[in-house]
Amino acid sequence: MNNNVIIGTAGHIDHGKTTLIKALSGIETDTTQEEKDRGMSINLGFAYFDLPSGKRCGVVDVPGHEKFIKNMLAGVSGINLVLLLVDSREGIMPQTKEHIDILTLLGIENYIIVMTKIDLVEEEYRELVKEDIREFIAGTVLETSPIIEVDSISKKGLDNLLETIDKKTEDIEAKNIEKNARLNIDRS
């Protein structure tokens, strides 16, 4: 069991990554004035929160815009678990696919799919979006990933998400600190 887990966000722009992390942690990860003015993440954001079991989760909140994919790449190398966010109004979008491709190439295997903004969509439509997600991830490493519905503003579904993260992290082993260290260098 790993008592310290690093979670990364992934997903299309405006699917609620930063809002979810603020709802879970109370920390605003968009820290620059430009990010606030533009209403989107540009740089990596960092936060943390504790799970019901007492495990601490560090979070790397990545930008979802295609122009900032290099920033996303810089942030995901050390994560143990991915929260893949999908807006329940839009479903899988281009950056969702690109983020999945990148994370798959990096060998990341632990995912929770988070359907966001559920307050804006009827349940029947959400079920259709959920079916589309299941079809899209069939045959991939995400195939058995749980899909959790949340509304980050009202905090509906956050307790279920926290419990799911807690359960999912039981199987994540701590990094072997006896191995040779590896330092990823951003060559931009």
Per-segment meaning from a language model:
Residues 14, 20, 39, 61, ...:
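Residue-level signature of catalytic and energy-coupling elements of molecular machines
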Residues 1-3, 40, 53, 109, ...:
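Short flexible coil/turn linkers enriched for glycine and charged/polar residues
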Residues 20-23, 95-102, 128-136, 160-168:
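Alpha-helical scaffold elements adjacent to nucleotide-binding pockets in ATP/GTP-utilizing enzyme cores
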Residues 15, 63, 156:
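ATP-binding Walker
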Residues 1-59:
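Conserved G1/Walker A P-loop phosphate-binding module
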Residues 56, 62-67, 76-128:
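Conserved Switch II/interswitch segment of TRAFAC-class P-loop GTPases
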Residues 25, 29, 33, 73, ...:
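Signal for well-folded cores of large energy- and translation-related assemblies
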Residues 135-188:
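Conserved catalytic-core segments of large NTP-driven translation/proteostasis enzymes
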